[in-house]
Amino acid sequence: MLYFLAEHLAKLEFLKSIYLRAFLGFVISFCIVLFAGRPFIKYLKIKKFGEEIRDDGPSSHFSKKGTPTMGGVLIIAAVLLTSIFINDLTNSLILLVLLSTIMFAAIGFIDDYRKFTVSKKGLAGKKKLLFQGAIGLIIWAYIYFIGLTGRPMVDLSLINPISAYPYYIGAIGLFFLIQIVLMGTSNAVNITDGLDGLAIMPMIICSTILGVIAYFTGHTELSSHLHLFYTVGSGELSVFLSAVTGAGLGFLWYNCYPAQIFMGDTGSLTLGGILGVIAIILKQELMLPIMGFIFVLEALSVILQVGSFKLRGKRIFKMAPIHHHFELMGIPESKVTMRFWIGTLIFGIIALGAIKMRGIL
């Protein structure tokens, strides 16, 4: 809407600035979540959409029972409303991301809603993967039939995060890469969302870093200087991601310890999906695990725990995901969360540093 006005009114030409719209996107989405947060929490309490706590979890978590969940509805609503207002809606990349966001949100919402109306287990795991796979198919079809960079060799390649060298993997290889990235990221963020504020801050950091990369890849000179693959219109993604960052920070206001609300699968699956989709568009599939190392660590801890128990009958950790392991070691929840935040910040800096190293190694 704002971009449309700038296109048709000469006096508002300045509103086309990516810097200005990114700033506005951050502020608007932050304010929406911040000011709508209290009444939304009150509404969820009235509807009794409260968190269920696993019986075998840390005893300190029993006090969280009944804490409103489905806060992801507020986050995603703020992001979508802000994006519609400030983004260029004729940009095909933005439309692709908006469509993906809505589809991931639908999966998460159905999962959350079923937990209160049908079964505490929510949507079956196989159905989740099936729906996530369908989103991956749409992303793959777009890249294969339309393209991103205008260079098929790049579009159908896996990019080395350090040297920026493209390894051609073809259409079939790209299909499986997209499925792994989308399912992996979406579910990893979901797994991480187990402590107050634990998932949202790493999400904010990763969103900010991807926003910076999106701006670089949409700029001919900067992308060339940093050995990134120029993608027409990707600068708009930095505007979208600023809205994600703002909404995330607004949510943290209520989600930090002790949490007044949880994001639920509506939030975690969708936010993880957004990271995955944009990383694919920007050809940063291998950079994402670096900046999102905490998400990778959490997912790996679950995989290793389940695998070890099935193969050896023994557990590696006191409890998985690994944040519960640290809790059972006697480390306070707030300290575990803060240390994970610090770890994400460190790996985020490493990811940005890796971009600068391109062309040197």
Swiss-Prot record:
UniProt xrefs under InterPro entries: Glycosyl_transferase_4, PNAcMuramoyl-5peptid_Trfase, PNAcMuramoyl-5peptid_Trfase_CS
Keyword flag Transferase: yes
GO BP field: cell division; cell wall macromolecule biosynthetic process; cell wall organization; peptidoglycan biosynthetic process; regulation of cell shape
A GO molecular function held by the record: phospho-N-acetylmuramoyl-pentapeptide-transferase activity
Pfam families: Glycos_transf_4, MraY_sig1
Location(s) in or outside the cell: Cell inner membrane
GO annotation, cellular component aspect: plasma membrane
Membrane-spanning segments: 17-37, 66-86, 90-110, 129-149, 162-182, 197-217, 232-252, 261-281, 286-306, 340-360
Principal location class: membrane
Pathway where this protein functions: Cell wall biogenesis; peptidoglycan biosynthesis
Source superkingdom: Bacteria
Keywords noted in UniProt: Cell cycle, Cell division, Cell inner membrane, Cell membrane, Cell shape, Cell wall biogenesis/degradation, Magnesium, Membrane, Metal-binding, Peptidoglycan synthesis, Transferase, Transmembrane, Transmembrane helix
The keyword Nuclease is assigned to this record: no
Entry cofactors: Mg(2+)
Topological relation to the membrane, as annotated: Multi-pass membrane protein
This enzyme's EC code(s): 2.7.8.13
Catalyses which reaction(s): UDP-N-acetyl-alpha-D-muramoyl-L-alanyl-gamma-D-glutamyl-meso-2,6-diaminopimeloyl-D-alanyl-D-alanine + di-trans,octa-cis-undecaprenyl phosphate = di-trans,octa-cis-undecaprenyl diphospho-N-acetyl-alpha-D-muramoyl-L-alanyl-D-glutamyl-meso-2,6-diaminopimeloyl-D-alanyl-D-alanine + UMP
Homology family: Belongs to the glycosyltransferase 4 family. MraY subfamily.
PANTHER family: PHOSPHO-N-ACETYLMURAMOYL-PENTAPEPTIDE-TRANSFERASE, PHOSPHO-N-ACETYLMURAMOYL-PENTAPEPTIDE-TRANSFERASE HOMOLOG
UniProt function note: Catalyzes the initial step of the lipid cycle reactions in the biosynthesis of the cell wall peptidoglycan: transfers peptidoglycan precursor phospho-MurNAc-pentapeptide from UDP-MurNAc-pentapeptide onto the lipid carrier undecaprenyl phosphate, yielding undecaprenyl-pyrophosphoryl-MurNAc-pentapeptide, known as lipid I.
The name this protein goes by in its record: Phospho-N-acetylmuramoyl-pentapeptide-transferase
